[in-house]
A protein has these predicted regions:
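Active-site helix of classical SDR
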Residues: 108, 112
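NAD(P)-dependent short-chain dehydrogenase/reductase
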Residues: 87-96, 118-199
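Conserved Rossmann-fold NAD(P)-dependent oxidoreductase catalytic core, especially the SDR/UDP-sugar
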Residues: 61-106, 132
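Adenosine-cofactor binding site in Rossmann-like domains, unifying the SAM/SAH pocket
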Residues: 2-22
Length: 199
């Protein structure tokens, strides 16, 4: 691909509908990969519930609608594996979506991601847009958040293992590495980037 347009969070607030529309109006955008989102670990999701649903809905609404309005040829929306029911069978299958109760701790985030998926589906049905969704597994990569309270499962595990290694007492029992019962696959960030280009 040539002429790739990217904006950091500091350069463009995707929650601001006027700024997002200006980006689309001033650039002929053919393909959009919507990977932007407010994300965090279980503690952040459960503590800042309103922020997670509001910010993610705003980002998705602005990008998806302007992609339609300005004739984007293809939009790829990256959802989240948390949209599937809390007690869903493993491995996860597409047909499990909306067939059970969501995990309470990240329910607002999951609902926002489900709304993004349904927006893409609805714009495809009503307007014939080539808007598709993929639900990647848990990701990690460069510049990930390794905070013990706000990160996702794998970065938190890496941080805990590092801390354990640094302990002079060599007491591994003091470090809890709990994946929980609903273990979900984990994929390095590069893998999803490479795979998404081929969808």
């Amino acid at each position: 691909y040539k002429n790739i347009i990217t904006r950091s969070r500091d350069e463009l607030d995707l929650k601001d509908s006027a700024l997002v529309e200006e980006l689309f109006k001033n650039n002929k955008i053919d393909i959009v990969v919507l990977a932007a989102a407010k994300v965090g670990g279980i503690l952040a999701n459960n503590t800042f519930r309103a922020d997670f649903i509001f910010e993610n809905l705003a980002i998705q609404n602005n990008i998806i609608h302007n992609s339609y309005k300005y004739g984007v040829e293809k939009l790829l929306f990256l959802g989240s594996s948390c949209i599937y029911p809390k007690q869903c069978l493993q491995p996860i299958k597409e047909e499990y979506l909306l067939n059970g109760e969501l995990e309470y701790t990240n329910e607002p985030y999951a609902i926002a991601k489900i709304a993004g998926l349904k927006m893409c589906e609805s714009y495809a049905i009503q307007y014939g847009c080539n808007f598709i969704s993929v639900m990647p597994t848990n990701l990690y990569g460069i510049n990930d958040n390794f905070d013990l309270y706000n990160s996702h499962v794998l970065p938190a595990m890496i941080r805990k293992m590092h801390l354990a290694k640094c302990l002079q007492e060599n007491n591994m029992d003091s470090i809890k590495l709990n994946l929980g019962e609903n273990y979900k696959s984990i994929l390095k960030e590069f893998g999803i980037s490479k795979d998404s280009v081929n969808i």
